[in-house]
């Protein structure tokens, strides 16, 4: 509560609620931050997924934390859960962000592997509002390169259409 009060005094407008498992969690946190603040609710558990509709209806935005979620759900189910969460939240006309393990290899390496690049683009294709880098920029050895890489991928995605010519793809 004290941290929230300090944040509000400093003009913080966005607050994230970790491990929201039920709509009551969102209500309790909302009462602490007030209606004027933006509440981003993190989905990180099986209970959170099971209560997603009610949680999303009470939150201003949803953030899928794939790292914490993968501690409770088999890794091979994460991409499908992510797709379902994104579509469900978008259907409610709420922003949905995806975090964790986007460019994880860039903690140590200057360039991501194709699998991570493809994962980022697939996440954008499914309709994610935004992408959240974490360890890549917090403890990574190449934080600027990670941000530049994600920005470039988003820029290319925003310009790409199914009819983009091979020549355009090769020259830009």
PLM-predicted stretches and their roles:
Residues 1-172:
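Non-catalytic helical/linker scaffolds that mediate oligomerization, partner binding
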